[in-house]
């Protein structure tokens, strides 16, 4: 059963009851997932940007957008318009497929993994998680990478509070660490 189907058939009715909501449309849901990678070295090394674009496209299965510097910062040796990172926004079927792969395949492959921090919510039910290395994703093989780079994964939900967002992600299988 896919994550989307499981959400519709079991998670949604359970959250409706647990959060004591009156309408099925009030139940929190995942709206989008953004995968972002900031590359400071992209200003000097164009190959690192190309490698990152290829890796993110392989991991997410979607075209990557290059993020550029909004203004020049002499201390970082960047000019306005220089590429400094890349990002992908996932919605719909690809979003659910990515979330399922993240929870079931990627997170358990992290070394010394005891669960993700429950403190990484932003106050509005959205969850951000930093990944230190791209090798946790099964699509990336060790031979093909030039350097170990991390990424930020933000899960945007329609939850109004952190508690609602956490209960949604917990029901979906996100392994939160118990502090």
From Swiss-Prot:
PROSITE patterns: RIBOSOMAL_L5
Pfam families membership: Ribosomal_L5, Ribosomal_L5_C
Keyword Ribonucleoprotein in record: yes
Molecular function via GO: rRNA binding; structural constituent of ribosome; tRNA binding
Family designation: Belongs to the universal ribosomal protein uL5 family.
Quaternary context: Part of the 50S ribosomal subunit; part of the 5S rRNA/L5/L18/L25 subcomplex. Contacts the 5S rRNA and the P site tRNA. Forms a bridge to the 30S subunit in the 70S ribosome.
Family annotation (PANTHER family): 60S RIBOSOMAL PROTEIN L11-RELATED
Free-text function comment from the UniProt entry: This is one of the proteins that bind and probably mediate the attachment of the 5S RNA into the large ribosomal subunit, where it forms part of the central protuberance. In the 70S ribosome it contacts protein S13 of the 30S subunit (bridge B1b), connecting the 2 subunits; this bridge is implicated in subunit movement. Contacts the P site tRNA; the 5S rRNA and some of its associated proteins might help stabilize positioning of ribosome-bound tRNAs.
Protein name, as recorded: Large ribosomal subunit protein uL5
Organism, as annotated: Prochlorococcus marinus (strain MIT 9313)
Gene coding for it: rplE
């Amino acid at each position: 059963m896919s994550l989307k189907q499981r959400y519709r058939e079991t998670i949604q009715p359970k959250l409706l009851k647990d959060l004591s909501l009156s309408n099925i449309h009030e139940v929190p849901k995942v709206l989008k997932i953004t995968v972002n990678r900031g590359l400071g070295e992209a200003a000097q090394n164009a190959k690192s940007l190309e490698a990152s674009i290829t890796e993110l496209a392989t991991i997410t299965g979607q075209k990557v957008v290059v993020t550029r510097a909004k203004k020049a910062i002499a201390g970082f040796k960047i000019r306005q318009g220089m590429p400094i990172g890349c990002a992908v926004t996932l919605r719909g079927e690809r979003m659910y497929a990515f979330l399922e792969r993240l929870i079931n395949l990627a997170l358990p492959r992290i070394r010394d993994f005891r669960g993700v921090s429950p403190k990484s919510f932003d106050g509005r039910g959205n969850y951000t998680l930093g990944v230190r290395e791209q090798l946790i994703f099964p699509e990336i093989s060790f031979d093909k990478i030039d350097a170990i780079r991390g990424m930020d994964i933000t899960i945007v939900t329609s939850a109004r509070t952190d508690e609602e967002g956490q209960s949604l992600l917990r029901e979906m299988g996100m392994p939160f660490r118990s502090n």
